[in-house]
């Protein structure tokens, strides 16, 4: 694929992917995280956010709450959800395994970088674009 051809040509041990579809990301914060990763010993990292909701596995078993619990979507248990704002990984691992990281704890599980939900409006559809336009106009005024 084009991505793997490109990775073969890149002269770097690590790759950082940036999601250009999130226009409200704080540039200074992005740079701070990139600088942290470059100085760290972690082999991979990914931006995430906390998602509070009711989640079940494919067998319809609750995964973040006990049956009959009274839960709130604003103050209950949460799961980490990837935002893909920044994805940082070892180039050789991607080329050898065709994945960013193995998703197994400490083999090497990616470091999770918690991101503020206010910056994470992701523009993938026309509706998303209209939402971003509205938020942008509110911020500007």
Regions found by a protein language model. Name each.
Residues 19-20, 123:
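Conserved residues at beta->alpha junctions
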Residues 112-141:
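Hydrophobic helical membrane-anchoring modules
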Residues 1-6, 14, 20-116:
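Conserved core of the sugar-phosphate nucleotidyltransferase
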Residues 8, 35, 134-138:
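Short, well-ordered alpha-helices that flank and scaffold nucleotide-derived cofactor binding pockets
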């Amino acid at each position: 694929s084009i991505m793997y051809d490109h990775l073969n040509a890149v002269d770097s041990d690590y790759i950082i992917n940036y999601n250009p579809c999130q226009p409200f990301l704080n540039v200074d914060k992005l740079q701070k995280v990139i600088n942290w990763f470059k100085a760290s010993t972690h082999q991979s990292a990914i931006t995430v956010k906390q998602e509070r909701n009711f989640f079940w596995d494919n067998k319809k078993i609750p995964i973040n709450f006990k049956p009959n619990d009274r839960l709130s979507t604003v103050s209950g248990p949460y799961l980490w959800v990837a935002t893909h704002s920044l994805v940082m990984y070892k180039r050789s691992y991607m080329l050898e395994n065709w994945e960013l990281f193995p998703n197994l704890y400490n083999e090497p599980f990616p470091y999770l970088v918690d991101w503020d939900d206010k910056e994470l409006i992701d523009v993938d559809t026309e509706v998303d674009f209209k939402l971003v336009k509205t938020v942008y106009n509110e911020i500007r005024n």
